[in-house]
Amino acid sequence: MRKGILLKTAALAMAVVMTFSCSIIAFASEDVDYTINNPYSGVDFGNWDQYKADLHCHTTASDGDVDMDVMIEEHYTQGYDVLALTDHGITSKGWTTVSSRNYFKIALSIADGKLRQITPLTEQRYNEITTGVGRNGRGMIEVPLGIEQNPTSLNNAHVNSWCTEYGDGVVGGTSNYDEVIRNVDETGGLSVINHPGEYTKAKEESCQADAYDESDSWYDYVINKFANILINYESCIGIDINSKKDGRTKYDRKLWDILLQKVIPTGRNVFAIATTDAHQLDKVGCAWTDLCMPENTAENVRACLQNGSFFAVSRYIKNSEELAQFSLETGIDWGTEFEQENRDGSIPAPKATNVIVNETDDTITLNVDHALTVHWIADGKVIAVGNTIDLDDFSDEIGSYVRAEAFGHGGVLYTQAFTLDYDGAPESNVKTTFDFGNILAELKHFIIEVCTSIPLGKEVYDFLVKPVTE
């Protein structure tokens, strides 16, 4: 009881301080002529729908514990509208077709102690799911040609891609982002950098201050490495900021803010998604991406991902400092880890209902259901609390963007960044880097060339990477 009183007192104090601070800022800040670039400007919130998408999950075709048909069915049961099967090194050829490779099936069958089964949907069940049988006609569709690239990476340098067959059966990938993202770009696909906290090892830090500390040579390298990739390849839409149950991505919102500061001044945005990365059924439902579209089609999914007209949503937060901020704003102690295990819809996650940008008044409003608080972030810092932000009140704290987070009993929602053009806007400070993964890629190509040149080497290699079709 005493703890609750203290928290409520702290919340009230914070509200008073922020109100007082805002009045000072409003007096001191300049009236800047902002051009607000709204990623939701083309969305008709009154007539369009938002479609719940899982852009990253696995099946027994690679290292998932769940058979293909069961994974699809679980997503359908939990109300997903869009699903991408993104097995390691295996391009999904559709829900009624087996897609795998011999090396995966052999290795994982040995690990399982039995032959690994891959069961696609029947044509009848496929038609039922895509037409919404049992869901009042609300079907679930597939994102075409999903795959998680770099399947044999030794340091989790993983990249998701869709809408291209590139990567099917391609091995390797340790530290190598540039080659795979370049090839996805050149073959007309889209990509995203998956759970960067695994590759960067930021997930192992004990506090946010140490994660992605640019004074650390390793973090400085990977930050600028990612920034250069995003600048060079616009088909790489951004990064995964909250996946699975957030244990490995808990500091990747900080990375996102750093990348936004570096990349936006070059003329492009960096979008953020949330995914399940489900290998087991208990991960389904932990996160998703709400796609704003007039109709649920593969063409609209692609356009939505390219335009950034979507919201990332998760039921998990493992960043204690973020939760401390939400505790102050709501007067509720959320502890150091937030986990909303409810899956029946009785505790809904925050849902955006409208985004309103007023260029004349330099204001942005996020209308959202099922949220206890909304706050606005600029350059990685919370600068305002409430559904509406007046940019002129915070002009001395704003750089090249603002973004919003909405939090409630059901989880957290992240908007995309609203990029800002104005006189005196920050300039880019991206350092030129070399992707040392390219050296490892060349070494991989050399080893494959040598191995396939010896007697029976090519036959063995071709067999291992041969597609499994049944």
Enumerate the language-model features and the residues they cover.
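Sec-dependent signal peptide cleavage junction
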Residues: 19-33
